[in-house]
């Protein structure tokens, strides 16, 4: 549903008829940035050099002034480069790549422009109450806020509420691009089949949606291979009995300061009940969500976004 928003140019690199790398260049109307993504390369500096030189040359021929990556076509698909904890299996929603890719990017003129973290939290004991988050939840409840999990019969309504909140609150994120509500629904409609709605929270004030926190059971990369019947069975099993949860999306209307900790408190209540570990996924440096539950953080995943100006010799004249 997103292909109408951009133009994607795919490339494959061969050495003696053997595939040694691939990449894609994505461009958007009225945007001077070329987005480099779908990056794969063997561990050979010479091959990486060819990829980045060809990518920059092509971006320049298109009239672009800079490159940013890795971005697999869209903010709504996948972006960022993983840079640590490669001994751990990928969690759902995690960008995953070879450990040496960072060096290949930086050796070829890219610099880190954004840094992100994911927090891995150990299970919360049932008796382990947290006064900060519990008190914040109680305080907002007393003020008339309602924080609750949606009912599956209301999924379509809640999806519309999420669209309005998420597209407004995420609009200042790097590489963010708008999309229509119709296409948003196409992207997120299938989530109804993988969510446990007890771990999805919506916040309302005077019956208006003002915040959200969306968690999914950790399916690893199985949700990307739904054509495999065995994966479908594993997904159904994990949905019924998750091993951990991934908190993928969170946002609060800026006129309701402090509500984020109340939303976090409502999820902590659920985590105390189920006794499962969790991951607070992909928070950008400077965002308050990076610090949520910091007393319970066991490990810290790190990711980056990189950029490079297109060299003058590659730029299209006029």
Where are these regions (language model features)?
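A conserved beta-strand-loop-helix scaffold within acyl/acetyltransferase catalytic domains
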Residues: 1-31, 149-250
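Catalytic cores of nucleotide-enabled group-transfer and carboxylate-activating enzymes in metabolic
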Residues: 1-23, 28-35, 41-42, 46, ...
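Beta-sheet entry/capping signal
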Residues: 10, 22, 33, 64-70, ...
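Short, flexible loop/turn elements at secondary-structure junctions
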Residues: 15, 27-29, 40-43, 71-73, ...
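Acyl-donor binding region in acyl/amide transferases
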Residues: 31-109, 229-295
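Flexible loop/turn segments at secondary-structure boundaries
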Residues: 75-77, 186, 209-211, 218-224, ...
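Acyltransferase donor/substrate-recognition loop-hinge adjacent to the catalytic core
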Residues: 95-173
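C-terminal "cap" of GNAT-fold acetyltransferases
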Residues: 120-136, 300-318
